[in-house]
Amino acid sequence: MLCGLAALDITPKLGENIPGYFEARRASGVREPLAVRALACSNASGACFALVNLDTIDCDPRLSARARARFERLTGVPGAQMMVSTTHTHTGGPVD
């Protein structure tokens, strides 16, 4: 089995909108960096899958569909083999 890991910092910039509250909130500091993390694995027969997790409140289905389509286009692995999830944090930035 082959596996690969990746992470990308998605910590909101100071002053950026923080969704998930009834009133408007802006990022005023960083306690812990936020990230999008990915794990991709394949076995000896070539079967592959990928797990992607975002430190965000949610992920719009249109965004995950675009990510799956890009994954499929770049790797040749069906987009259905990619799972997208979130940590549902109320301290992350907006997801576009």
Predicted feature residues:
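Conserved beta-alpha junction segments in alpha/beta enzyme cores
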Residues: 1-96
